[in-house]
A protein has these predicted regions:
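Pyridoxal 5′-phosphate
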Residues: 1-374
């Protein structure tokens, strides 16, 4: 693959020998080192099961790794099970009441709409939705919706719909000016480009690890700022929160983000994620961004030249490009499958997401398929 593999990572991903995989926005393949970590965990569970208990201590290593990745501190990191759990922790912990409102935009993930519609019905809150304009949602679109009764402003840092990458700081400033919490679902962002929770003004962030973080299912790092941590009420309890046992079955609970780690986690998934974060750190997130956003730009230009209508706005700085399909979905799927090119085809759209192991040649191969779909 020569110069088309500037990161030198293609050999780490066996899938590249079999097909052109441009679907990491759905599920990313994992590198060999992560496979090895997961295999080692399962082998030890089979042959030395009592040693699995020692993995509890490795949580602190994982917290430190993720904290470095997002410019936080380890005591601001909890280890949850899924992205959806993070926003539920925020929504339940703020004790929303009738008359409060939550502001999202229509490029957000479905979980948020399910959550806040349920809270509309059960607690009488109001869900306010900023509309997108040609695939973008700017701070100016949020501004009219945020007021003194806004408790949460929630966005997907990068939209799963079209890869739109929000300009976070202006939205954070609007939220904070009214005393609201700024939360982000970052599953389509962490691992794709450098994340700085301080510079962005994010109060809380959660992300599953099976997409751009190159790991498995069942673990989702959760960042919560110290200031917000002090405001959140706990809605679930268990032994993993305990800092100190007191007489007569009383307990002193952790005051750091570990207070949200209430029960045993998926230790195998945690081991895989630790290996994946080490891999990402070795390759370099900034280098990954330069390569993958470059591939996405090449793809965007090619699709535009072919005459496709694009849902992704021009100049967008993410690794996801979505085009509208004009042919029947069955025909579109068949065209990509015949070429052994994996993308997401659904709801009249084609989402294409190059990752660190993809090459410019593969983008050109994809464009050969889309040329036949004009």
């Amino acid at each position: 693959m020569g110069n088309s593999d500037p990161l030198g990572v293609c050999a780490d991903f066996p899938i590249v020998a079999d097909r052109t995989y441009l679907n990491s926005a759905y599920i990313a393949p994992i590198p060999r080192s992560v496979v090895a970590a997961g295999t080692e965990f399962l082998h030890n569970k089979s042959t030395r099961p009592l040693e699995v208990g020692e993995l509890i201590g490795t949580d602190e290593t994982l917290r430190a790794q993720f904290a470095r990745l997002v410019n936080a501190t380890p005591d601001e990191i909890a280890l949850l099970f899924s992205t959806a759990e993070g926003e539920n922790v925020i929504a339940q912990g703020l004790d929303l009441v009738a008359g409060d409102n939550v502001v999202v935009d229509e490029l957000h993930y479905p979980t948020e709409f399910v959550l806040y519609r349920a809270l509309e019905a059960s607690r009488g809150i109001e869900l306010r939705i900023a509309k997108h304009r040609e695939g973008r949602v700017e701070a100016s679109d949020f501004a009219p919706l945020i007021d003194r009764r806004t408790r949460i402003v929630s966005v997907a840092w990068v939209s799963h719909h079209n890869g739109f990458r929000h300009d976070m700081r202006p939205i954070a400033d609007l939220a904070h000016a009214q005393g609201a919490v700024f939360y982000t679902d970052a599953i389509q962002a962490v691992g794709m480009f450098p994340i700085d929770v301080q510079a962005s003004g994010v109060d809380a962030l959660c992300c599953g690890s099976y997409k751009w973080m190159l790991a498995g299912f069942g673990i989702a790092p959760f960042y919560v700022s110290r200031a917000l941590n002090e405001r959140l009420k706990l809605d679930r309890f268990g032994e993993f929160q305990v800092d100190r046992e007191l007489p007569d079955h009383h307990f002193e609970l952790a005051r750091t983000a570990r207070r949200f780690d209430y029960c045993s986690r998926a230790f195998g998934a945690a081991r895989e994620l630790s290996a994946a974060l080490a891999y990402l750190e070795q390759v370099g997130i900034a280098r990954i961004e330069e390569h993958t956003v470059g591939l996405a730009s090449r793809l965007y230009a090619g699709l535009s030249k072919q005459g496709h209508r694009l849902f992704t706005p021009p100049g967008n700085r993410s690794s996801i490009v979505t085009m509208y399909a004009t042919k029947p979905m069955a025909d579109v799927r068949a065209a990509f499958q015949a070429a052994k090119v994996d993308v997401t085809v659904r709801d009249g759209e084609v989402r294409i997401a190059p990752a660190l192991f993809n090459t410019s040649d593969e983008i050109d191969q994809c464009l050969e398929v889309t040329r036949r779909l004009v």
